[in-house]
From Swiss-Prot:
Belongs to the PetN family. SUPFAM superfamilies: PetN subunit of the cytochrome b6f complex. It comes from Prochlorococcus marinus subsp. pastoris (strain CCMP1986 / NIES-2087 / MED4). It is found in: Cellular thylakoid membrane. GO terms for molecular function: electron transporter, transferring electrons within cytochrome b6/f complex of photosystem II activity. The gene is petN. GO terms for cellular component: cytochrome b6f complex; plasma membrane-derived thylakoid membrane. This is Cytochrome b6-f complex subunit 8.
Length: 34
C-alpha cells in the first residue's frame, strides 16, 4: 500500500508542477523557458 501512496503523491506533484509551468509560461515572465 505504501508504494501506491507514493505513486499517487508523485503523480500529483508532477501534475501540479506541469500546471504551474503552463501558468508561469503564459504570464509572459520570460525568466522560465522550456
Amino acid at each position: 500500500m505504501m508504494i501506491f501512496q507514493i505513486g499517487w503523491a508523485a503523480l500529483a506533484a508532477i501534475f501540479t508542477f506541469s500546471i504551474a509551468m503552463v501558468v508561469w509560461g503564459r504570464n509572459g515572465d520570460g525568466s522560465i523557458d522550456i
